[in-house]
Structure formats: structure tokens, C-alpha cells
Amino acid sequence: MADAEARAEFPEEARPDRGTLQVLQDMASRLRIHSIRATCSTSSGHPTSCSSSSEIMSVLFFYIMRYKQSDPENPDNDRFVLAKRLSFVDVATGWLGQGLGVACGMAYTGKYFDRASYRVFCLMSDGESSEGSVWEAMAFASYYSLDNLVAIFDVNRLGHSGALPAEHCINIYQRRCEAFGWNTYVVDGRDVEALCQVFWQASQVKHKPTAVVAKTFKGRGTPSIEDAESWHAKPMPRERADAIIKLIESQIQTSRNLDPQPPIEDSPEVNITDVRMTSPPDYRVGDKIATRKACGLALAKLGYANNRVVVLDGDTRYSTFSEIFNKEYPERFIECFMAEQNMVSVALGCASRGRTIAFASTFAAFLTRAFDHIRIGGLAESNINIIGSHCGVSVGDDGASQMALEDIAMFRTIPKCTIFYPTDAVSTEHAVALAANAKGMCFIRTTRPETMVIYTPQERFEIGQAKVLRHCVSDKVTVIGAGITVYEALAAADELSKQDIFIRVIDLFTIKPLDVATIVSSAKATEGRIITVEDHYPQGGIGEAVCAAVSMDPDIQVHSLAVSGVPQSGKSEELLDMYGISARHIIVAVKCMLLN
């Protein structure tokens, strides 16, 4: 706390009077009563965790924060993120360790995009400080000088299984926060006046985020339960709860309420609906360009169309080509460094309340580390767009650690998530534009090697609509691919046609939702024969998605070609053949299917 602002005297005009302090204390007591009653009625919940933070909540919501109670989605309202295992508005966090990253995204948006006065408060448990994602967020907030962000550590000593590593050694938490570059205050979390003071002082600090390390006690105000182990996530027995509620009620001295301060209304108006590219794709059939590069170009083009498009990257921007966007719009590019978990949570925060159209990009393989954050974003139905490059064995020389072979399966499990797998540059640009306007999470899967443009600039694309690239009345088998395997399917079709064997070739474009109508009609036109081919593991991939889509039709047979085993390093075309997804293997599969 070397900064003068951090040591600022608490001015008389900002101090709550004795009556206000009593009201804040009484409100904390009422919050305890509400938590006891709510958890008893459902036989589930965390009354002891609620009790430890009641004074913090009372001071924040009824003295410090500025918001309109009648308009909780107001863009000028202060934001509150509850990272403890409790429900809250704006963005769900669920498992611990995600809330601070979301708060960072909100604070970054407020400071750099909205340039508004609203502040962001994040309440965390001491237990979740064992999560690495917390410290990814701490580093991010410090690096970007998020002085509109306050993180409150509710240090109540106890976790689910007993005492936490640091217990009540408050100085350990203080030193850790200060080491990460945060302005840090230590406070008695039961003292409403002290809480009012440190939150006011935090509002005076510039160029640094503030951490408030509050010493609290789990189950505060409940005799024989306060600071006792084995009460985590346990509602109180009803007969005991009634006595405790009466005890707490006896300590309440006033029925007065406090109204929150109104927000400062200085957020800009934002329109992120019906975002359109300003011109068609500028590619010609036969051009060669990697879809990862086409994606970077499309992001820059979208950024020109709407100034609320923002791009985040995890220190891979020269490989994902998000650097193209960064060069054009550096003020709307967020470098998150090698912290994929935090990158996803920051994107969730940026997109909250409809303030931005957020795209987060990195290697698709690296997104597996962030899956828990992705999953919670899906549960919240957040409108974020995630781009995963370097997919499948077609990555080539970089080897197995860089090859995403699980990503489709991962994103298929996310409710209402749209999965784009564009084949060429034209379809990639359309995928980016469609994702910007889609509801819910979107995942765009891009490829490392250059591929040929096969669609004209005038081609139209829609979510859930596949493209039939080859078809005739003599087709015997439907071959379904996406991305890199579409080219293998087309090559197989050319070779087979020389032998008077004709196959129908489908480019899925979106893996979720599938174009079931086109798949089924094509299968029926080819005597019920389908072959899927994908640069992905068989589990959870395109083959399984297609099988599920046609499972009720006993006359349709599906044969899947997919990568099996741990891949090696090599040339892209060598690996496609080695792992059974090249044109040669498609030809063999077609002939075997016809023999059967």
C-alpha cells in the first residue's frame, strides 16, 4: 500500500453515521436469517458460508455499490461477481476459481471499452485461492491496471474437508496479493465500519486493482457452529434453526432499510445486433489459404463492421492470425498470455450484459485446459465465440501435443453450442459472421495447412445447413466430411468416378446443429450407405454425431473413418494417410461397403 491513494484518510462526508452502521449490521443479520431459512426449506445449501460474508454483502449492496434495484441489467450499474459456491446474476461460475476471471473481463470492458464509471466487485472464498485460475486472473488484472476492480477474499479458515492450508494466517494472503501487484487491505470482516473504510479507500486507488482480505468466521452468529468443522454445505436442523433465528432476531435493533446509490450514467449506447460484413468474401476458387488465416482476416473485417467486436488470444496470435485484428484494432485486442482458463473467463465477462461481441482464440488443443470454464459459460448461455486452430493430425510436424483431436467431442457436450467446421476461406468468413450474430456459445474449428478455395464469394451459408458438393443419380455411397477431410472426399470421388463408382460428397459446415435432413435424404438416395471421415478421434466426433442423427432409421448404415491411437509427427498428407482418413482409405471403405 505504498500509493498515497491507498492510505487516504476516510473523510467525514464518506463515513457512515452510527445509525447507518447499525442498519448495515442489522441487514447482515437479516441476510443470515434468510440464508438459514432458504437452506432449511430446500434441505441444501451453504448457510455457514453465507454467514461468514454477511457483513461484506451488507456493506457492498447497501452502502458501497451504485445500481438501480428496478433495473438490474442497467449497463451503468456496478457489477458483482459471487465466486463463492452460491448463485448470482450476470454470469454463472459454478465451480470455484472462475469468478475473478469473469470480473476481470467486466472490469476491462468498463475501463477500456465503455470508459465508464461502473466498478466491479468479486467476492471469493479463501478455499478457491488454491485454484490456479485465480492467480491467472490476479496477474491479468495487475498487468492491465484494472483499478475499477475489487476482489474480496472471505477468509473464514474452513473448506469442505476441514481447515485450509493458511487457515487464519491473513498475512499469507496479503503477501500473495501484493506479490501479484495488487493494492491490498486487511480487515476484520465482521466490522462494518472498517469494511466501509477500505471499500472507500479502494475507490481512490489508481492504476492498481484492490484486494480486500477479510478475516471472517464460518457460521458467524450461530452458537456451537461458528468456526466449527464439519458444517460445510449442511443446512441446520429445523429445530435448531428456529432457536438460532430467534437469537439473531434479538440482536436486530432497527427495521430501517438503506437504498443503494444510483449509478453514474455514462456508459455508451451499444448495438451488437444484426452485425454484417461490409462486402462479400474476397477470394477466388482455386486460391490457397489456411482457414486459420482466413479466420484472422474475417475477424478484422468484422471489426471494421462493428466497433464492439473484441478479440482475445492466449499468446498464439501469430499462429492463429488474430494478429491481423490486433494490427487493425489494437485497442480492441486483449492479450491474455498463456492462461487459457482465464482467457475464457475474461471473454465471458466482456460479453456479459451484451457489451461486446467477444472472440477468444488459441490452439484448439490448449482449450482442453479451459474446459471447465467453457462448460460453465455454456450453462450460463453466454454469447462468446471461441476459435480453435491447429486441429487434427493435419497439423503435421508440430506433433501430438499440438493436435486437437478431442475438441469436437468437448464442444458437442455444451448445451446450445454451435460448432462451425469451415472447409475453405469463404466458408470461414461466413462462419465468423454467423457466430457474431448467434445466440449462445460458438466454436469455430480451423485448420493449419493451406487449403483450396472451393466456394464462390456469392455462396450463402446458414447454421445447420450442409453443402452437397458432388451428386448424381448414380451415387452409391454418401461420404460426409468437414474441413480438411472434404478435400480427401473430393479426391476420392474423382478417382472412383474413373472406375464408374459415384459417391455423394457432403461438407457439413456445422457439426452442431447437424443438417439431418440433408444427411438422411442423401443416405436414402445412396441405398442407405454413409461413410464419415474426420480429423478427430472417433469418440464424440462427426461419426458419432451422424450415427445419433440416423439411429432411428434401420435402413441406414454408417461407417466411420477417424484418427485412432496417439499420433506422430510428420507431413500433413503422410499423417492423414497413416491414420486412415486420406482419399485412399475412403476409396477402400467405399468399395468394402459396396461389397457388403
Swiss-Prot record:
Subunit (UniProt): Homodimer.
Name of the gene encoding the protein in the UniProt record: TKTL1
Annotated Mg(2+) binding sites: 126, 156, 158
PANTHER family according to UniProt: TRANSKETOLASE, TRANSKETOLASE-LIKE PROTEIN 1
Cofactor: Mg(2+); Ca(2+); Mn(2+); Co(2+)
InterPro entries: THDP-binding, Transketo_C/PFOR_II, Transketolase-like, Transketolase-like_Pyr-bd, Transketolase_BS, Transketolase_C, Transketolase_N
Molecular function via GO: metal ion binding; thiamine pyrophosphate binding; transketolase activity
List of residues binding substrate: 46, 232, 292, 319, 390, 398, 448
Biological process, per Gene Ontology: glucose catabolic process; thiamine metabolic process
GO cellular component: cytosol
NCBIfam families reported in the protein's UniProt record: PRK05899.2-5
Stretch forming the signal peptide: none
Residue stretches in coiled coil: none
Keyword terms: Calcium, Cytoplasm, Developmental protein, Magnesium, Metal-binding, Thiamine pyrophosphate, Transferase
EC number: 2.2.1.1
Positions of the catalytic residues: 340 (proton donor)
Location(s), subcellular: Cytoplasm
Family indicated by similarity: Belongs to the transketolase family.
Note describing how the cofactor binds: Binds 1 Mg(2+) ion per subunit. Can also utilize other divalent metal cations, such as Ca(2+), Mn(2+) and Co(2+).
Site features described as Important for catalytic activity, chain residue numbers: 46, 232
Positions bound to thiamine diphosphate: 49, 94-96, 127, 156, 218, 232, 340, 366, 402
Protein name according to UniProt: Transketolase-like protein 1
Predominant location: cytoplasm
Catalytic activity: D-sedoheptulose 7-phosphate + D-glyceraldehyde 3-phosphate = aldehydo-D-ribose 5-phosphate + D-xylulose 5-phosphate
Enzyme class: transferase
Function of the protein: Catalyzes the transfer of a two-carbon ketol group from a ketose donor to an aldose acceptor, via a covalent intermediate with the cofactor thiamine pyrophosphate.
Biological source species: Homo sapiens
Tissue localization of expression: Widely expressed. Expressed in endothelial cells and in peripheral neurons (at protein level).
